[in-house]
Amino acid sequence: MALNFQYPFQCIQFVERPQAKLLLASAGPRLYSYSAETGQRLASWPQDTSSSDQEPPEKKRKVSTAEGGSVEESETAEKTEKSKAPPAWSNIPIVTSTSNGEYVIAVTGEDKCIRVFQVQDDGSFQQLSERIMPKRPSSIALTSDETTILCADKFGDVHSLPLIPSNEKPAVAPRPNREAKLSHPAATNLTVHTKGNLRALEQQLELAKKKKEAGEEKSGPSFEHHLLLGHVSLLTDMLFVSLPSDTHKRTYILTADRDEHIRVSRGPPQAHVIENYCLGHTAFISKICVPRDAPEYLISGGGDNYLMVWNWTEGRALHKVPLVEDSSAAEVVVRGIWATTLGDLRLILVALDGSSQLQCFTLEADGSLKPQTPLDLTGNVLAVTSIEKDNTLLISVDSVRTAGSTNEWRASPSAPSILLEAFRLQQGTEGSLGWEPTLQSATGAINAVGTLEIAATTEDKKRGELNDLLYAMSKLRKTPRGGEDE
């Protein structure tokens, strides 16, 4: 039997529930949960309906035929056919959860849908809501009380919506379609008699119909949501940050866009108030990060070959940190910036698109980033999560493309595919950092069971589409003439 590739984990997140430690992940069009201790797969969503051994007995119903007789038709068979229909999305690019791991928020790709799940005690997902946004979400954040979702989209807007929607439909006063009323002709075919005027009337009626249909299409979502702020460029990342003050906590929304801007806005209900900007990048910004243990600092990166460290409350650049050698001509795309605290060290981890190295820095007291020995993985780094109590990193890697490339596929799949690797921090005597493999039993179990398969014989066109699902940020780069890379 020929081997096939496996969808890599696009997102991974460790959560600690009262009942168990879980690892949540997305790969292709599916969401997964695993035991972080054993690696056992607990659940997937949408559920795999290939096995019928747990299905209830078929129900029969009588259906009349054209000849006047009747035949029995299986309701289960009809439901099975519906369940076999492929999902309306091909990937789940954004996954986050509440701090206690009870609720998971996932964004499914093509349908622009924000889905909220409740994680059950057995690790299964119960979907509570699905809300289709006006534009495709590019980043999701939760407010400090974890009752509100903030959604940044590719149109440049940030909306807020409740984590758990109320059962009551929001009372939204309908807007009078004044334009349609004014544009509708007052004449009818009873008052117009000449052929020329009749043709003009038909054209006016057709135009009025199109305007009415366009007005209906432009109506916004029916669920509760509020527009908080907007950029003139598509948003690439967003953070919600809470800072303590003498009287109460001050909240902020930090947004980054394709046009090299980082904006600092006040939190709701004053999100329209702009505190300042952090300006200094010369290419698009793809990721911003505020360490939980050092919220006064902001680390940003994107299409430049360096990171920037900011005092973001003042809009002041503190440090510029190179990511590649000056002699390197390769274009850089920062895939992810993660902050974690392992032991007494505050670490900043950085992944670049198409790189099998995870760059590691320690965040010093003055905000500077001290380079450490990078971690070398078996494939391109896709996502990182940490188990801070165990000084451990879990890293998802791309086992489909050749390490170091975003478009060239490996000659053949491996068995099993390496989807996840784990390392434990080892601190040297003189402050140097080292890493040793760990959790090999758990990662081995996860890798062994795999995800959905990708045929090794996939055609080039389909391969290109799958590449774009993982490595599309490079298209944010502008050409020298000010256009976009297509």
Predicted regions and their residues:
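Conserved strand-to-loop turn within each blade of WD40 beta-propeller repeats
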Residues: 27, 107-110, 152-155, 163, ...
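Short coil/turn segments that connect the beta-strands within blades of beta-propeller domains
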Residues: 19-21, 100-103, 145-147, 243, ...
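Terminal intrinsically disordered, low-complexity extensions flanking WD-repeat/beta-propeller proteins
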Residues: 3-14, 30, 48-78, 165-221, ...
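WD40-repeat beta-propellers
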Residues: 34-35, 114-118, 158-163, 262-267, ...
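Short C-terminal beta-strands that terminate individual repeats in beta-propeller domains
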Residues: 44-46, 83-86, 129-132, 171-173, ...
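Canonical WD40 repeat/beta-propeller blade segments in eukaryotic WD-repeat proteins
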Residues: 6-15, 81-97, 135-142, 229-245, ...
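Beta-propeller domains
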Residues: 21-74, 107-124, 266
